[in-house]
């Protein structure tokens, strides 16, 4: 009752022909102790077929990639599809930035939506926190280096903790993808 009607069905690639946005989440699951980069060979092989099949039926949509390693697979999908770079997008560090803001907010006792802070770079083990620009409504966070490192380590390791606890991540990335789609369809011009 809160989200309206949702229709779910099993289909095939021809169902993508009129899609404005095609979200790809397919791939091998990350196992406990496995890095996102460890998934590259398996998921690159899976993606080769997926991208080929999608581009056979759709040449106008936007590809939104969530499968890890997301940055590399977004790049290879762009190259393989032959589509403009502006139409092949990865989920990037949006989820990392959301986790980062949540942990900062938890530390400061402030709603994470009021925290301005970003994780940049590659999604995963080499991501970078931008502490120099992190603030609450323009006010410095005043976090010591030890607290900053703890928050960043917890941000970076959140997915591994979830994978160890329940085997996979799903809900948070789904919310991140929903946010990206809303920004695209609403032509928001948002920095996510």
PLM region spans:
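Long, compositionally biased stretches enriched for glycine and/or charged residues
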Residues: 105, 109-192
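Rossmann-fold NAD(P) dinucleotide-binding segment
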Residues: 16-63, 76-80
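Rossmann-fold dinucleotide-binding core
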Residues: 26, 62-140
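Conserved N-terminal Rossmann-fold NAD(P) cofactor-binding segment
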Residues: 1-19
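Short helix-terminating capping/connector loops at secondary-structure junctions
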Residues: 2-6, 57-59, 84, 111-112
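Short, solvent-exposed loop/turn segments at secondary-structure junctions
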Residues: 31, 72, 163-165
């Amino acid at each position: 009752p809160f989200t309206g009607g949702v229709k779910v069905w099993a289909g095939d690639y021809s169902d993508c022909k009129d899609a404005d946005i095609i979200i790809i989440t397919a791939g091998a699951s990350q196992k406990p102790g496995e890095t996102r980069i460890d998934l590259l060979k398996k998921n690159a092989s899976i993606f080769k077929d997926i991208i080929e099949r999608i581009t056979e039926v759709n040449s106008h949509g936007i590809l939104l990639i969530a499968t890890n390693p997301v940055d590399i697979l977004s790049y290879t999908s762009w190259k393989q599809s032959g589509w403009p770079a502006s139409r092949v997008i990865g989920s990037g560090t949006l989820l990392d930035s959301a986790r980062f803001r949540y942990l900062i907010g938890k530390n400061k006792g402030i709603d994470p939506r009021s925290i301005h802070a970003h994780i940049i770079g590659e999604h995963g083990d080499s991501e970078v926190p931008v502490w120099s620009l992190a603030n609450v409504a323009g006010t410095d966070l005043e976090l010591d280096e030890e607290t900053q490192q703890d928050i960043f380590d917890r941000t970076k390791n959140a997915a591994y903790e979830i994978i160890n606890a329940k085997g996979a991540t799903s809900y948070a990335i789904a919310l991140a993808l929903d946010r990206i789609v809303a920004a695209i369809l609403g032509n928001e011009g948002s920095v996510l």
